[in-house]
């Protein structure tokens, strides 16, 4: 088994596409997060900014997570100091949004009532809330970021959230005995 970080692709087909992903696609995806309020939602949840929660879905938090995952894998293949610093700034917003017990879903923390059809009136109330889906993408991003950089900043956020999930869900008395509603947290 060869770790992908030890593979160097140097051909006329994939190399330009990988470079385009690093220099165009990833920055464009992050700009969309900025434009559409994804980062603002974390800043609001973390008390760093005032304002209304933006977006149309309870799972909008996954957009930054998925892009962090891809950007981290890109960093692992070709280091980019600017991208690394940008990831640090985004991760700081995510960490600020995490509640003290590890909970992290911005539309719930921000009490976005117009999305309450998705999440209800309190944590873990509705199966279609996508809270665990959000967590699953957080975990994948955190692992990718840690593998790429060795930094624990997002990994520590993910572990704190996973510890909460393990306390809340399970077979024991007092725990929730429900499916996740959308696969990914179990990965």
State what each model feature region is.
Residues 1-187:
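Glycan-recognition and catalytic cores of secretory/periplasmic carbohydrate-active enzymes
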């Amino acid at each position: 088994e060869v770790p992908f970080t030890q593979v160097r692709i140097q051909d006329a087909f994939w190399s330009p596409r990988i470079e385009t992903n690093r220099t165009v696609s990833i920055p464009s995806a992050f700009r969309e997060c900025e434009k559409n309020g994804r980062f603002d939602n974390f800043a609001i949840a973390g008390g760093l900014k005032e304002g209304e929660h933006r977006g149309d879905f309870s799972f909008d938090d996954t957009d930054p997570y998925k892009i962090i995952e891809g950007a981290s894998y890109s960093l692992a293949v070709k280091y980019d100091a600017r991208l690394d610093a940008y990831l640090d700034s985004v991760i700081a917003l995510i960490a600020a949004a995490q509640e003290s017990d590890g909970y992290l879903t911005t539309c719930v923390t921000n009490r976005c009532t117009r999305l309450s059809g998705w999440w209800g009136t309190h944590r873990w109330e509705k199966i279609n809330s996508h809270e665990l889906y959000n967590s699953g993408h957080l975990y994948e991003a955190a692992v990718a970021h840690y593998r790429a950089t060795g930094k624990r900043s997002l990994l520590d956020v993910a572990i704190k959230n996973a510890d909460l999930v393990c306390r809340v869900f399970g077979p024991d008395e007092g725990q929730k005995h429900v499916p996740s509603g959308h696969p990914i947290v179990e990965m």
